[in-house]
């Protein structure tokens, strides 16, 4: 995806940034692959919903789908997920891997926000509607995927559980929408933060805000800042890297 951005972006500086992001993402894949192999054996396959969304973003030649879909939404969710893992894990190696990965990801997410700030106001009404509608659809798909038991089929099977039994029990016991609304009341909820990002970028408008208002108070969001989840961890990683680089400088 990062490599494909080089082909659809027109600004030379943006092309150079996308090329650099490609290198960083390759580093992340290598790091996490080696970590998972060393600690757990092999990774689980990507779930069907997320896999479908990623395939749609990668295969599209439409710039806004790549920027909004990956740089703002997927990268934003990754920052939140990495931040929760960093907080919960007792493994110092994983903490370090997550911290430095998040230092890269924060810039990837910010690139998307800069693009939106500069581009969305210049779109025609028809173009803006396309961006708004597609973003709302992907947001809702990702949001429901958070509490989607079908996504965890491989996990259930790995511990000897019949995924059909677990899914049926889950659907009988949980009110999905209520669970989502309750979780999105937390100020650091990754989807709440993502919603703020889209709102501040004027991708959520009066026309589409009902999709999001079903789960979160939009007036509250408008009064809050839109710092990406986990930015404090990313900044800590950057500070560490600066100290390392300073120590390597030769007079």
Segment roles from a protein language model:
Residues 48-72, 88-89, 135-153:
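Acidic/His metal-coordination segments adjacent to aromatic residues that form catalytic metal sites
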Residues 5-16, 39-40, 82-100, 114-130, ...:
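Inter-helical turn/loop segments and adjacent helix faces that build the functional surface
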Residues 8, 23-24, 104, 136-138:
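A short structural micro-motif
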Residues 81, 111-119, 133-140, 144-145:
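An internal, amphipathic alpha-helical element
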Residues 126-251:
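Extended, helix-rich structural scaffolds rather than catalytic motifs
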Residues 21-36, 68-82, 101-112, 116:
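Alpha-helical transition-metal enzyme core signature, strongest for iron centers
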Residues 2-59:
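Long, hydrophobic, well-ordered secondary-structure blocks that form the structural core
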């Amino acid at each position: 995806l990062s490599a494909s951005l080089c082909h659809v972006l027109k600004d030379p500086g943006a092309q150079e940034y996308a090329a650099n992001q490609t290198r960083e993402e390759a580093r992340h894949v290598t790091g996490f692959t080696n970590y998972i192999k060393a600690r757990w054996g092999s990774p689980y396959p990507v779930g069907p919903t997320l896999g479908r969304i990623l395939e749609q973003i990668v295969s599209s030649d439409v710039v806004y789908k790549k920027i909004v879909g990956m740089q703002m939404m997927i990268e934003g969710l990754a920052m939140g997920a990495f931040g929760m893992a960093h907080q919960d894990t007792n493994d110092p190696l994983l903490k370090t891997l997550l911290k430095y990965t998040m230092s890269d990801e924060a810039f990837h997410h910010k690139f998307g926000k800069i693009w939106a700030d500069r581009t969305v106001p210049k779109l025609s009404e028809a173009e803006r509607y396309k961006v708004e509608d597609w973003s709302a659809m992907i947001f809702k798909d990702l949001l429901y995927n958070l509490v989607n038991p079908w996504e965890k089929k491989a996990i259930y099977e790995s511990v000897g559980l019949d995924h059909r039994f677990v899914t049926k029990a889950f659907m009988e016991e949980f009110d999905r929408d209520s669970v989502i609304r309750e979780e999105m009341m937390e100020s650091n909820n990754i989807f709440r933060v993502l919603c703020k990002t889209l709102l501040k970028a004027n991708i959520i408008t009066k026309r589409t805000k009902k999709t999001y208002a079903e789960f979160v108070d939009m007036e509250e969001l408008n009064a809050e800042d839109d710092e990406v989840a986990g930015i404090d961890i990313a900044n800590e990683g950057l500070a560490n890297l600066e100290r390392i680089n300073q120590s390597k400088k030769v007079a």
